[in-house]
Amino acid sequence: MITFVIALNTFREAVRDKILYVLVAFGVLLILGSKAIGYVSFGQDYKIMADLGLTAIWMFSGMVSIFVGTGLIYKEIDKRTIYTILSKPAERWQFLLGKYFGLALTTLVNMVFLSIAFLTYMWLSGAPVTIALFEALFLTFIEMLVVTAVAIFFSSASTPILSAIFTTIIFFFGQLTKWIVDLATVLQGSVNGAAAKERARYIGGLLYKVYLVLPNLHNFNIRQDAVHADPGEWIRMNEMLPVTLYGLSYAAAVLLAAHLIFSRRNF
C-alpha cells in the first residue's frame, strides 16, 4: 500500500514536470513530420513513416526515463521531504520501488500517448498497421523498464547531472552489445604474434566482461524487422517471453543493487 502511494505521488509529480511535455511535443512533431520525409523516398513512404514513428517513440520514451528519473530521489533529498517519508512506516525498499513504479507508469502513459498518435496517423495515411508494430512497441516498453531501473540506480547514489550522464552512457552502449561481443570474439581469436595476441586477448576479455554487465538492449530492438513485416505476421512470437523475462530480471537486479546502495546512505 505504501509503495502504491509513493508510486502515485511520483507519477503526479512527474506529469507536472515541464520537460515531459516538451519531449512529448517533440515526439508528436517528429511522428507528424515523418510523412513529409517519406515523400522523398519513392515507394518507401509508409516504411519511412513507420521507422521514424517507432524511433521517435523509443528515443523520447528513453529521454523521459533518463531526464525525469535521474532527478526523482535527489529532489526528495534536496527538498528534505525524504525525511518525512522515511520517518513514517515506510521502508527504504518501498520508497525505491514506489519511485520506480511511478516513473514506469509515467513512461507507459507517455508511450501510450505517442503510440496512439503514431498508429492513428499511420491509419489515416493509409499505411498498414501491422501486428509487428505492436510487438516493437511492447519490447520498447520492456526496454524502458530496464532504462528506468538504471536511472533509479544512479539517482539513488549520485546527483541528477551525473546520473543522467551515466544512464545515457548505459543506454547508448546497451544498444551496441552485439557489436561489443562480436569484437571481443574477433580480438580473442584472430590476432597474429604472441605479444599482440596477448594484448588482444586481454582487451577482448575486458570487452566481454563489459558485455556481461551491460543490459543487452539490442535484444529489444526489432524496429527494422517490424517496418518490413507483412500485415498479420508475427516476427518474434517465440522470443517475446524470454526477452521479456530477461528485461524484467535485469531491472529487478538493478533495483536490488540500488537498494543495497540506498540503504547505506545516511539521511
Residue ranges and their predicted role:
Residues T81-I85:
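Short cytoplasmic-facing helical segments at TM-TM junctions of multi-pass membrane proteins
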Residues R16-L30, L103-L105:
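Alpha-helical transmembrane segments of integral membrane proteins, especially early/N-terminal helices
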Residues L23-V28, L162-G174:
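Central hydrophobic cores of alpha-helical transmembrane segments
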Residues V40-Q44, T167-L260:
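Terminal transmembrane helical anchor/hairpin motif
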Residues I31-K75, L96-A164, D182, E198:
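Secretory targeting signals
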Residues M1-Y21:
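Aromatic- and glycine-rich beta-strand/loop motifs that create alpha-glucan
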